[in-house]
Amino acid sequence: MLITNKFVTRNCKRSRYSQSADIPLTIQGAGNRRISHSEIEKNVDVNVLRKVAPHLEESIKFRNAPKIPSDVLDMIGNRFSCVEWSDYGDRPLAIQEDMAQFLKRQLRSNYLRTFIFRSDLIDNGELNDLFIEFVKRPTFKSLIGRTGTYISSQVVIAAHQAWLSRRSFEVGTQEIRGFVTPESLSALTAQVEITWDRKPHPSVPSASEFVFGAERMADNHGVDAYCIAFAFFNKFVE
């Protein structure tokens, strides 16, 4: 259960940080020692966040592009399996530098399995390199670019090549979703067979396989692009 603008604890005693009902930060977890799920809104009370930051684990979402001081971001650890950063305005925004460094730190973490984002930061060369390393890990599960967010063809190709070389898997289904330019799609189709006008939908395959769908549509700026969905189904999971 999530309640907007409140701290919420589930299956545990009430946190001593849950007295205010006007703090745009939603939390689920086991008391104040370990908070397993957090959603941080744009106008978060930084002083309160500073108190709970060391206790955040497992899943963290930054909604509506919150601006958080670097010292608070430094207090948040790297023990997240899922990290999400998004801005729900009319168009994706570039991420502030301190937050960008935080997200890069998460991408380097061996705990991370799912990364979800909506931003123009995909054009950042260093982040693109981290995406490539991320999707090549056997623990990689999902890389999802929200509406209008571009993903480099190099990232998809790296994930595909890593998938082909594996003999065993730690994750049952792996997926990449986002937008690509027509030029990037050409690079992809040279190496991967795609299914036009149909996004792949996860199902239970008879064996390990992958599917790749592409659908032509305009991005947030009205530019001609392709929305892709690339999924690996791994039957033989360790």
Regions found by a protein language model. Give the residues of each.
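The conserved beta-strand core of Leucine-Rich Repeat
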Residues: 1-238
